[in-house]
Design a protein with these regions (language model features):
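Carbohydrate-active catalytic/glycan-binding domains of CAZyme proteins
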Residues: 1-294
Length: 294
């Protein structure tokens, strides 16, 4: 592949997200420099094999659209109705709260331009890490985090979107708090902040619905997993054991023509984050690590 010179260890991003299309892997993420604050947008890296990557190409310039006030976080690119939609978190100029915006492009390489009418998370909430979910009836939803910075015990929520993904069209539903899972650290301090990060939805080969998300367990960043017991987004779910509990998280899963992968960033130390790729297996009623890493 022309101009392929980077290995994963050379790529310093948080919150990796991969879109696989036509034999190529498109990698997006938060520019880790300054923890993604005022970094001016997002890049895309391209690979044929998950090992050798192109130099980054800017795919969204947040300065151009006056969206570089602070946070430029967690870009995800979803193909929907023939176009490419980027869900990403920015700090708003108006109220200085973070929220998820939707951007649009005709190509996975960008350039992306603003698409949504504003945030597609609640206006007065501080939110991050919105992801797109399409239910069995083809209706779009956003799944996102209500931040611990505003409510102490962070939550994961969802809400319906308009068919064109330009606005939120219903009241949010809270799924759970960071302190809810059976394995969560049970603090003696009620005002201790608890983090929720990075939801991502996946439907298995047997039509089971899962959600990846991240938090901290015993002080280390962790990749967690929820199973929706009736196969649809709602309040009937089970917290499964964490997939990774040793300083790695904000992951997502993707398939190529042969294999199934989890990507996440690790370590969680600013300046040292890199995308990692682990082969996983869809066994229908669960997602399991195969313990091999690209």
């Amino acid at each position: 592949m022309r101009n392929t010179i980077l290995k994963c260890k050379d790529i310093n991003i948080r919150d990796p997200f991969v879109l696989y299309e036509d034999g190529k892997y498109y990698l997006y993420g938060t520019r880790a420099r300054f923890f993604g604050m005022k970094v001016g947008g997002f890049d895309v890296y391209v690979s044929d094999d998950l090992e050798n990557w192109s130099r980054p190409t800017e795919c969204f310039n947040s300065r151009k659209y006056k969206m570089n006030k602070a946070s430029n976080w967690a870009p995800e690119v979803h193909k929907y109705n023939g176009a490419y939609y980027m869900f990403a978190t920015f700090t708003r100029q108006s109220n200085r709260l973070r929220g998820t915006f939707v951007l649009k492009s005709d190509s996975p390489l960008g350039p992306f331009v603003p698409h949504s009418k504003g945030v597609v998370t609640p206006e007065e909430w501080e939110c991050l890490d919105g992801t797109l979910y399409i239910n069995r009836d083809g209706k779009p939803y956003i799944v996102f985090c209500h931040e611990h910075t505003q409510i102490i015990d962070g939550t994961i929520c969802y809400a319906p979107l308009s068919d064109d993904l330009s606005e939120i069209i219903g009241e949010p539903v809270t799924l759970f708090k960071a302190s809810s899972p059976y394995w969560a650290d049970k603090s003696k301090y009620p005002k201790e902040h608890r983090i929720t990060d990075g939801p991502f939805m996946y439907r298995s080969k047997t039509d089971e619905l899962f959600m990846l998300w991240s938090t901290f367990i015993k002080g280390k960043y962790a990749q967690c997993l929820v199973k929706f017991n009736d196969g649809e987004l709602g309040m009937n779910f089970t917290h499964l054991p964490p997939m990774i509990d040793n300083d790695g998280g904000h992951g997502m899963v993707f398939k190529d023509n042969k294999n199934f992968y989890l990507t996440f960033h690790s370590p969680n130390t600013n300046g040292f984050e890199h995308p990692r790729f682990i082969e996983i297996e869809d066994i229908g009623n669960n997602i399991v690590l195969k313990k091999t890493e690209v």
